[in-house]
Amino acid sequence: MNAVDYLRISLIDRCNFRCQYCMPDTQDLQFLQPTAVLTATELLTLIRDVFIPLGFARFRLTGGEPLLRPDILDIVRGVIALPQVKDLAMTTNAFLLEPLAQDLFEAGLRRINISLDSLVPETFATIVGRDSQRHKRWNKVWAGIQKAYQVGFNPLKLNVVIIPGVNDHEVLDLAALTIDRQWHVRFIEFMPIGNADLFCDRGWIPSEELRTQIRDRWGLTDGQVQGNGPADVFQIPGAQGTLGFISQMSECFCDRCNRMRLSADGWLRPCLLNETGQLDLKTALRDGVSTDELRDRVRQLLELKPEINYKERQSGTVGANYSRTMSQIGG
């Protein structure tokens, strides 16, 4: 297993979308009260005094939708100001991104991932949820993507969750975005966290099937740059951008895992695919437990992580019953 140096941080469990695979509008979700969410000060304390001393140097801000946090710019500035931080990125649905992109860039953010599950506004509307404004959302998301590209975010990555019978017919169109643009499209296998009923009904498509479609159309070569995350990177010959495939269902990448996840209410989770070994850091911090003690607890969990990842992995892929949605975990 790789050295664990990457923390995904959910800033908020709320979102302005209700995507089918994450927090469907058919579910009656109970969102956290504002007082239950880590404050910016608490979060920066944990990053500075607990995680960085343990070797964490790369951080990603997620949600829910992180741009719903009114203090998002302060959080970005605070993390960037820590000298040990090597990388800060964000994952967003881009609905609120266009007016914020320049400010985020000036605050120090350089890398951004944007969820874009369809290029067809009607299909996109079906995926993001039923409300009176849903048909207008694709245009705002696309404007946010264009603005981020214009401002200079690099790399700019587009995350695509493929759902059988919903958007699987768009694989080639989405892959084609990388040909003339220095964009990076990442296909993510649909998994049961968030909507187990839809998962059981629709199933999922292995990454290799998507690669075969793309390979048959254009050819496919190994990407020139391979990250240290879970994505297998490829490239259409001559394309400016790359294609990534995150295959948590079909191709175990536990040996490459380098991350933990911190929920908006301060629960530290060592593995996405199961709920073993979670630590409640927020309650401990508010109860006056020292950051030295919290650091020791996280260190012990880091030592257990390989066993949790390998031995408990199947509990998250077959018959799993998750108590938290993807929006609560932080993706």
Curated annotation (Swiss-Prot):
GO molecular function, one term: S-adenosyl-L-methionine binding
The keyword Lyase is annotated on this UniProt entry: yes
GO terms under biological process: Mo-molybdopterin cofactor biosynthetic process
Binding site for S-adenosyl-L-methionine: 21, 64, 115, 191
Residue positions binding GTP: 8, 60, 91, 157, 259-261
Top-level EC class as recorded in UniProt: lyase
Species name: Acaryochloris marina (strain MBIC 11017)
Gene3D superfamilies: Aldolase class I
Stated name of the protein: GTP 3',8-cyclase
Family, as annotated: Belongs to the radical SAM superfamily. MoaA family.
Residue sites binding [4Fe-4S] cluster 2 per the record: 254, 257, 271
Co-factor(s): [4Fe-4S] cluster
